[in-house]
Every structure is written in C-alpha cells, then in structure tokens.
Amino acid sequence: MTDKTVQQQDESQLVAARRAKMGRWIEDYGVYPWGHREDGLISLESARSLFDQSAHDAFKEDDSNDARPRVKVAGRCIQHRAMGKLTFLVIRDDTGDLQISCSKAAMPIEQFKVASKLDYGDIIVAEGAMGMTNKGEICVWADSFTLSCKSLAPPPEKFHGLNDSELRYRQRYVDMYTSQDTIKTFKARSLIVSTIRTFMHGEGYLEVETPMMQPIAGGAAAKPFETHHNALGI
C-alpha cells in the first residue's frame, strides 16, 4: 500500500467523522450548516480598526459601562483552542485574521458547544464587542455565534502548508486557503488586468476573445501506423 493510498484512506475517515459531527449538530443543536445569508457583516480588517482602547479600559474598570463598539464578522476557522469555559479561535477572510473569544457565560449553551468543537475550515459568523484579551490580543468577545458552513474536507497541514506544486496550480482555492501570499498575488494580478482593461477601453479599443484551444476534440481522427525500433529490432 503506497503512502498516497494511506493518505487517501485517512482523509476519507476524516471526512466521514466530520459528516457524523455535522449530523449530530443538526440533531442536537439545530444548526443549518449549508450556508445562509447574513446581513450587516464587515471585514475583519474593518473590525480590527474599530477597536477603542479607551472604551476597553473603561469596561475593565466598570463592566456596567460598556461603550465598546459592536461588530458582526464572518470567516474561516484557521486556529482553535477550547479551554473549559472559554474557547478561542482565529478566523480569516480576504483582509486578514482576527481572534474570536467565546465565553460559556456570554452566549447560549448550544452556540458555545458548537464553538468549542469546531473543525479547521469551518466558516462561522460571530457578533460581539471589540475588546482585548489578557495577553493583549485584539479580539471579538462574541455573545452570538453561528456556524455558517461546515467544512467536510480536511485542510492541508497547518505547518507544512501545500507543498504539491501541481495541486497548487490545479486547485487554486486550496492554495489560497493556505497562503496569504497567494491571495495578495491574485489581488495584484486582478488589479493590474482591470487597470489595463479600463485604460484600453477608455482609449476606444475593443476587447475580442480569441479561442486558444481547439474546441473540437480531434483524438478520434488519428490514424494507426507502424514503426520500427532499430536497436531492439522490433
């Protein structure tokens, strides 16, 4: 049995385990893990910029005076730590990363149980006040937590990333999942192409698409032939 076969079997077992977990969540907590519309979301970069140090300090001195800005964010889980009555996770979108802090006392118990058992790759929506952890990390102290979409396929290893260059080129979405540099590259490329296209249109040029590959399969039209191998005499 090859290493690739073993890896495929391991991935199949992980997918089966995630499917089973999703089924339990649907039955026990009533989650809807197939994606749904969420209004009022802002990017993680925008949420981080709303952090107010003075409001955070005032809240620490008197928790009845909560003037911290509230945000609603969504992203893909890339880190997860469950620590009893607290769960910390890091989510990512196309603007960066942000920590979400979940307290058992601050949200419905069903939501906290889902948050404490997330898998890497799950897409979540969190709503709460912008604050800071005891270690000085800016975060969202969530009081509302929703699983927006369950990830069934396990992501590439956290530390090694995606080393298979062929897989990177064939499955760009996986490459973008593992590498922020890839996202930056595609953003830069998109901006360059868009700028060139806008300039050319402004100069009166017309964009015309030209087929680069033959649209009609021609393999069946090949004719069989005989050849001779001089060295082997066959």
Kindly give the residue locations of the regions a language model identified.
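Class II aminoacyl-tRNA synthetase-like tRNA-binding/catalytic domains
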Residues: 2-28, 33-234
